[in-house]
């Protein structure tokens, strides 16, 4: 069994790391370069850097910050937010990213995933899916399940999250970064039903995201959700736990990790 990965996530806006609840109510968590260096030192397996307002602000990639982060980090770095084209992938890889994450652009133009994967390889193409459980009338109309949201969680695309994950993997995504919008920042644990549904449906690794409040939640994402990697922000940013503590807890629960 391959080692399961722990991935701290840096949500960045205005050049600062922030953290919110259900994608809003953002509070400052610090300087991205300093925080990235700290996680690198703590033994994180990878880092994910998301420019969370690039798409909604129609801004370009923040390459200088990405270069500064990459210079401090000697583990795989995934960068997302505002990634729109195959050319953007080239620019990010040149700036020091190891993987690039598409979200809204993949919804607008699914061919970009096929093209980027063909050019640079599936191993550096991640598709991020922000999913929200259907409620009320949506359930009556379309049945139980989850919809995909774009533009930083502001727009319901009407796409089914599980079907979309399958389509993205088919087109060449090497990994799915799956965030439960319902759980984001709530500290109540991953949406394990969502994680399991997507993990069971695709043949590529799934990174569970959204809702981690304690170390057991990380282990649950792997053991109950079927995730290959688990992503967290709040519990690490504000010093509640270190990556090392997270790995030790996962090992206690019988999950293979790199210590």
From Swiss-Prot:
InterPro entries for this protein: Aldolase_TIM (IPR013785), His_biosynth (IPR006062), HisF (IPR004651), IGPS_HisA/HisF (IPR050064), RibuloseP-bd_barrel (IPR011060)
Active site (record annotation): 11, 130
GO cellular component, one term: cytoplasm
Catalytic activity: 5-[(5-phospho-1-deoxy-D-ribulos-1-ylimino)methylamino]-1-(5-phospho-beta-D-ribosyl)imidazole-4-carboxamide + L-glutamine = D-erythro-1-(imidazol-4-yl)glycerol 3-phosphate + 5-amino-1-(5-phospho-beta-D-ribosyl)imidazole-4-carboxamide + L-glutamate + H(+)
EC number: 4.3.2.10
Metabolic or biological pathway: Amino-acid biosynthesis; L-histidine biosynthesis; L-histidine from 5-phospho-alpha-D-ribose 1-diphosphate: step 5/9
Compartments where found: Cytoplasm
UniProt keyword list: Amino-acid biosynthesis, Cytoplasm, Histidine biosynthesis, Lyase
GO MF annotation: an example: lyase activity
GO biological process: L-histidine biosynthetic process
Protein origin, superkingdom: Bacteria
Matches recorded under HAMAP family: HisF
Biological role stated in the UniProt entry: IGPS catalyzes the conversion of PRFAR and glutamine to IGP, AICAR and glutamate. The HisF subunit catalyzes the cyclization activity that produces IGP and AICAR from PRFAR using the ammonia provided by the HisH subunit.
Subunit structure: Heterodimer of HisH and HisF.
Family of this protein: Belongs to the HisA/HisF family.
NCBIfam families hit by this protein: hisF
Record's protein name: Imidazole glycerol phosphate synthase subunit HisF
Origin species: Acidovorax ebreus (strain TPSY) (Diaphorobacter sp. (strain TPSY))
Lineage: Bacteria, Pseudomonadati, Pseudomonadota, Betaproteobacteria, Burkholderiales
Encoding gene, per UniProt annotation: hisF
């Amino acid at each position: 069994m391959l080692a399961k990965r722990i991935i701290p996530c840096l949500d960045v806006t205005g050049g600062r790391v922030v953290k919110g609840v259900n994608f809003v109510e953002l509070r400052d968590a610090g300087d991205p370069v300093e925080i990235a260096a700290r996680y690198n030192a703590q033994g994180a397996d990878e880092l994910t850097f998301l420019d969370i307002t690039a798409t909604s602000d129609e801004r370009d990639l923040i390459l200088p910050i990405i270069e500064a982060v990459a210079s401090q980090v000697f583990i795989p770095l995934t960068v997302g937010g505002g990634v729109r084209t195959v050319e953007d992938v080239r620019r990010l890889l040149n700036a020091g990213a190891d993987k690039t994450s598409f979200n809204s652009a993949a919804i607008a133009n699914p061919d970009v995933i096929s093209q980027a994967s063909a050019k640079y390889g599936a191993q550096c193409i991640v598709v991020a899916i922000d999913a929200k459980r259907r409620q009320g009338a949506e359930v009556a109309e379309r049945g139980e399940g989850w919809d995909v949201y774009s533009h930083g969680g502001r727009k319901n695309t009407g796409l089914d999250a599980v079907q979309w994950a399958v389509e993205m993997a088919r087109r060449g995504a090497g990994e799915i970064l799956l965030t439960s919008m319902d759980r984001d920042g709530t500290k109540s644990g991953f949406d394990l039903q969502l994680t399991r549904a997507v993990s069971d449906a695709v043949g590529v690794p799934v990174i569970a995201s959204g809702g981690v409040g304690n170390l057991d939640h990380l282990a649950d994402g792997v053991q109950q959700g079927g995730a290959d990697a688990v992503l967290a922000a709040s519990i690490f940013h504000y010093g509640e736990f270190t990556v090392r503590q997270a790995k030790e807890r996962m090992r206690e629960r019988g999950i293979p990790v790199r210590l």
